[in-house]
From Swiss-Prot:
Gene from which the chain derives: ubqB
CDD domains in UniProt: Ubl_ubiquitin
Further facts: Ubiquitin is synthesized as a polyubiquitin precursor with exact head to tail repeats. Some ubiquitin genes contain a single copy of ubiquitin fused to a ribosomal protein. In D.discoideum there are 9 genes: ubqA: 5 copies of Ub and a final Asn; ubqB: 1 copy of Ub and ribosomal protein eL40; ubqC: 1 copy of Ub and ribosomal protein eS31; ubqD: 3 copies of Ub and a final Leu; ubqF: 7 copies of Ub and a final Asn; ubqG: 5 copies of Ub and a final Leu; ubqH: 5 copies of Ub and a final Asn; ubqI: 4 copies of Ub and a final Asn; ubqJ: 4 copies of Ub and a final Asn.
Keyword Ubl conjugation tagged: yes
Glycyl lysine isopeptide (Gly-Lys) (interchain with K-? in acceptor proteins) crosslink, residue number(s): 76
Protein name stated in the entry: Ubiquitin-ribosomal protein eL40 fusion protein
Positions of the Ubiquitin-like domain: 1-76
Disulfide bond sites: none
Gene Ontology biological-process entries: modification-dependent protein catabolic process; protein ubiquitination; translation
Amino acid sequence: MQIFVKTLTGKTITLEVEGSDNIENVKAKIQDKEGIPPDQQRLIFAGKQLEDGRTLSDYNIQKESTLHLVLRLRGGIEPSLVILARKYKCDKMICRKCYARLHPRAVNCRKKKCGHSNNLRPKKKLLK
């Protein structure tokens, strides 16, 4: 059967598939035609993102249906740098009066506006 894949640029790609084809196969066919790696592709049908392990028939995709192709966001940070960033940003003390960020072993606030308060708390940890 024939299905259509529409990109965000408005370009429509025609693919020859079977209902038993899984989503990974469809993404591989898109890669063959357009050169977009499957790990960067997200396919949407009827407002739902299609999961790799499922088949076209699981989503009730019929002949001449239109799928929408969007690309994953690029960027991010290397995993080893995430750990370093969390440590750098979280190992601080916070003044409860003026909310100043202080070094981890601080006993008193360094700001004059709170009277160099000793009312400090540890900075809350970031969630994953």
